[in-house]
From Swiss-Prot:
Homotetramer. Forms an RuvA(8)-RuvB(12)-Holliday junction (HJ) complex. HJ DNA is sandwiched between 2 RuvA tetramers; dsDNA enters through RuvA and exits via RuvB. An RuvB hexamer assembles on each DNA strand where it exits the tetramer. Each RuvB hexamer is contacted by two RuvA subunits (via domain III) on 2 adjacent RuvB subunits; this complex drives branch migration. In the full resolvosome a probable DNA-RuvA(4)-RuvB(12)-RuvC(2) complex forms which resolves the HJ. Residues 1-63 are annotated as: Domain I. Pfam families: HHH_5 (PF14520), RuvA_C (PF07499). Keywords: Cytoplasm, DNA damage, DNA recombination, DNA repair, DNA-binding. One of its GO terms (molecular function) is four-way junction helicase activity. Residues 64-138 are annotated as: Domain II. Residues 138-142 are annotated as: Flexible linker. One of its GO terms (cellular component) is cytoplasm. The keyword DNA repair applies. It comes from Petrotoga mobilis (strain DSM 10674 / SJ95). This is Holliday junction branch migration complex subunit RuvA. GO terms for biological process: DNA recombination; DNA repair.
Length: 190
């Protein structure tokens, strides 16, 4: 089993990335954070997962252990598998995904590729206890409240990435804060 790879990014192609390890160039499926934070020529020790089936061998690479752990948990959910798990982690940050599961947000989960309402409900029921080790401060607060949702949408409109917003929100005491106050607090920390 391959767990980590020290590799150099050679090129990005559609859903894949070419990585060079010594004299070998391999094709891998990257997570959103690999796409977001790395560019051609960067060398990094990626977390990895090698999936072998009778039809295919696929390598998936991740920026950190949390992403790989989320991928490993996702692919075990019935009717998900590594392909859909990879597509999910190319559209959302692992911490944001954990937040969606912990807050039981079927609407946000349903917006991910390959996920409908029933699959979102299945993800919540099968993964609800899987990410307690990765919970953030925002998990214990009312993520579902309208003020917070409106603040997140406003900050995204201003150009901030959701994963950045969620990290800051995890540091805040959201009790009784209005939308404007949440935005103001986030802007001072972003």
């Amino acid at each position: 089993m391959i767990r980590k790879i020290n590799a150099t990014i050679e090129d990005f192609e559609d859903e894949k990335v070419l990585i060079k390890i010594g004299v070998l160039t391999l094709e891998a499926y990257p997570s959103l954070n690999v796409i977001r934070y790395f560019k051609k020529g960067d060398q990094y020790e990626f977390f990895a997962s090698l999936e072998i089936s009778e039809w295919n061998t696929s390598l998936y690479i991740f920026k950190d252990k949390i992403e790989r752990d989320v991928f490993e948990s996702l692919k075990k959910v019935s009717k998900i598998g590594p392909r859909i798990a990879s597509k999910i982690l190319r559209k959302t940050d692992a911490e944001e995904f954990i937040q969606m599961i912990n807050s039981q947000d079927t609407a946000l989960l349903s917006s991910l590729p390959g996920i409908g309402k029933k699959t979102a409900e299945r993800l919540i029921s099968e993964l609800s206890n899987s990410f307690s080790a990765y919970s953030t401060g925002a998990d214990t607060q009312s993520y579902g409240n309208n003020n917070l949702k409106e603040a997140i949408e406003a900050l995204e409109t201003l150009g901030f990435q959701r994963y950045e917003i969620m990290k800051v929100i995890g540091q805040l005491d959201l009790e009784d804060l209005k939308t404007e106050e949440i935005i103001k607090e986030c802007l001072t920390r972003l």
